[in-house]
Amino acid sequence: MEKRIGSILLAVCLLLLASCGAKRETVAVEPDIAAQSSVPEADLTSLRQLSQEGALWQLDGTTLYTTVAAPQSRGKLLQTVDLNTGKRQALCSKPGCTHQDESCGAWLDCESEIAVLPMEDGRLVLVYGRYGPLEKQGAELSAAVELRDTSGAVLCPATPLPHRPSGAFYTDEIAVYYLREQWQEDGSADVSLIRIELDAAKGFGQASTAAFWQLPVMLSLTERCTEQGMLAIRWEHRMEGQTQVVQHRELCLVQWDGTVRTVAEAKDEQAFLVPDTGAIAAFCFDSATGTMARLDLATGESEPFARLPEGLQLTEGSACVGNVLICNFIQDGEAKPFYLEKGGEPVEIRRQTSHNGYLRPAMVLDVLEDGRLIVDLGDLEYEESYTDQTGQWITSRTSETLLGVCTPEQYREGAADCLTLETNHKF
């Protein structure tokens, strides 16, 4: 049985940060960086992010969508979890169904990554790697998109996509979009914003390029978008002895109209933090003084936000809820998440969770619309038994990740009072 939620990688970004930059004027970029749209009806200014890479899938904070391996066949089963009660059920309306194999209404012909993208009108867009007739010997790994309603009924059947998507997904409520990056030998990237049609009358599943950029070597998209475009960070690296240090230079907005606007400029050893989930925001941390500042994305101006211990180094994993920032640092080689409230004292989150026998801090995985957090509570280990292809009875140990829902304030206190979501093992 597979794990539902992958581990959050705590890879240290060796950043020594100082202060935030000032307002800069919009600058036009070279023609080869300009966005090119082949979809006139695409309204990119209304795009909202549906998920981040490896994210949980939920829309309004009431229902979580997830998948598990089908117990008695290949493929997967689509399940829902009520985020107010923690109860889990298969997304299947067949009377008397046992939810075991491909006869279940929740079954998907899926063998790898899947994205469940809830739309505001109640439809579910499913994007996943495929088994079966779409997979040709020696061909590029295939993917499919299909459309279902909230009962699990298929509205548009699985339709092949030209390549397998990865990373974040976006929507304008008419279509869904994702970024496709193709790296060149010189380190630059050809980045396409791919649009997937959802209207059956216009060719459900048809993929087209809504925007295209040729980004220079050291300009990296963050996957967070605003009405104007995609947030990005321009960076460079330098050597300190035998250590390569990544150093941010500019926080930028790669705009839909093909220009790149510098939001804030770094000096000396400065860098920026764009939270992975929750509110779209940008921060600047000074490692030498422990000062965290918040940036205005329109003007680039900064205001003090919080002060932390000196010498911390930012690492991956962050969430923003109103005036609360939760982010992860490395101190003396150890990962430490902190709860920061504007103008308040920082609180180190000391709750530890176990993953494959290793302890690590309880991590925030997503932010719900009502401001609650989905938190990784560690692994639930248990025995499972099954009959293999030879008819032999097999017993083995496996695990799945426990998830909890809590308010930011409950998380600050160690998430002891959080709502624990029902696991597939219990289900």
Per-segment meaning from a language model:
Residues Y65-T67, V125-Y128, Y177-R180, A232-R234, ...:
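Residue position within the beta-strands of beta-propeller blades
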Residues M1-L9:
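Bacterial N-terminal signal peptides that target proteins for export
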Residues L16-S19:
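C-terminal motif of bacterial Sec signal peptides marking the signal peptidase cleavage site
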Residues A35-R74, V274:
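N-terminal export/targeting and maturation segments
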Residues V29-R48, G75-D101, E135-P160, E185-Q214, ...:
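Surface-exposed loop/turn elements that mediate protein-protein interactions on large endomembrane-trafficking
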Residues G21-K23:
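Bacterial signal peptide processing site
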Residues A70, R130-G132, Q182, E236-H237, ...:
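Residue-level signature of beta-propeller blades and closely related beta-rich strand-turn architectures
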Residues Q49-L59, Q100-P118, P162-E173, Q214-E227, ...:
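Repeated scaffold domains used in trafficking and secretory/extracellular systems
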